[in-house]
Amino acid sequence: MAKVEVVNKDNFKELVLDSPTPVLLDFYANWCGHCQKLLPLLDEVAVDMDGKINVMKVNVDENRDLAQKFEVKGLPTMILFKGGSEVDRLIGFMPKDKIAEKVNAKI
């Protein structure tokens, strides 16, 4: 994949829950400064971990139901899904190497 895909309520099941590849899903908002700082790092993670994980993002303002379903309380929140289930949650901005370290520990 090697790029960050956009997820919404219509394609969430197909792209995240039914994915045979683990998915790192970033819950973000356009008004969130830390979210905007994180986006280019996630682009790099998508390239660096291509074939190991799919990196996706969901705008919480446009997909409030998904944010509520997964009890997203702060932004950015990244949830790692494997086999359709949440296996880890990363809250707040963090450097690329820390994201990769946490993801690699769970996949």
Q: What are the residue ranges of the model-derived segments?
A:
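Conserved Rossmann-like nucleotide-binding pocket used by diverse enzymes
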Residues: N8, Y28, N54-M56
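Conserved redox-active cysteine motifs that mediate thiol-disulfide chemistry
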Residues: F27-L41
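Non-catalytic, surface beta->alpha helical segment in thiol-disulfide oxidoreductase systems
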Residues: K82-I107
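A short beta-strand-turn-helix
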Residues: V4-V23
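Structural alpha/beta surface segment adjacent to cysteine/selenocysteine redox centers
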Residues: L66-L75, I79-F81, S85, F93
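Structural microenvironment flanking redox-active thiols in thiol-disulfide oxidoreductases
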Residues: V60-L66
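Conserved helix-turn-beta segment immediately C-terminal to the redox Cys motif
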Residues: P20-P22, K37-V58
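Short pre-active-site segment immediately N-terminal to redox-active cysteine/selenocysteine motifs
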Residues: P20, Y28-W31, G74
